[in-house]
């Protein structure tokens, strides 16, 4: 079982070939290929290689499946006795990707 730990959008993800996951929004369009070169670790056949902080020459390629927005969260500010109320919503944009290959 081969897996890698990649960094994108300020977060780290454990990925395997064929995985589909949601990452922070990427600029690539749907159907395009994205290459992640910030690979922190790779495990092949039980042997783990850890970078310092990244593994040189390692890369993970993925295909952009879709773009979208996450669930809505409500932000409500309130101050008592002053009739101050502010209600806003936020939906975080994401990109769904499918991992194609792990090299390195």
Swiss-Prot record:
GO biological process: translation
Matching Pfam families: Ribosomal_L21p
Keyword Ribonucleoprotein carried by entry: yes
Lineage: superkingdom: Bacteria
Keywords, comma-separated and alphabetical: Ribonucleoprotein, Ribosomal protein, RNA-binding, rRNA-binding
Keyword ATP-binding listed: no
Single GO molecular function: structural constituent of ribosome
Assembly and interaction partners: Part of the 50S ribosomal subunit. Contacts protein L20.
HAMAP family referenced in this protein's UniProt entry, alphabetically: Ribosomal_bL21
Name recorded for this polypeptide: Large ribosomal subunit protein bL21
Lineage start: Bacteria, Bacillati, Bacillota, Clostridia, Eubacteriales
């Amino acid at each position: 079982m081969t897996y890698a730990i990649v960094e994108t959008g300020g977060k780290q993800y454990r990925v395997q070939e064929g995985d589909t996951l949601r990452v922070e929004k990427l600029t690539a369009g749907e159907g395009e290929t994205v290459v992640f070169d910030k690979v922190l670790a790779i495990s092949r056949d039980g042997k783990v290689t850890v970078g310092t902080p990244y593994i040189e020459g390692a890369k993970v390629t993925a295909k952009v499946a879709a773009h979208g927005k996450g669930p809505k969260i409500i932000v409500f500010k309130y101050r008592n006795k002053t009739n101050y109320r502010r209600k806003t919503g936020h939906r975080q944009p994401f990109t769904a990707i499918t991992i194609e290959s792990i090299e390195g």
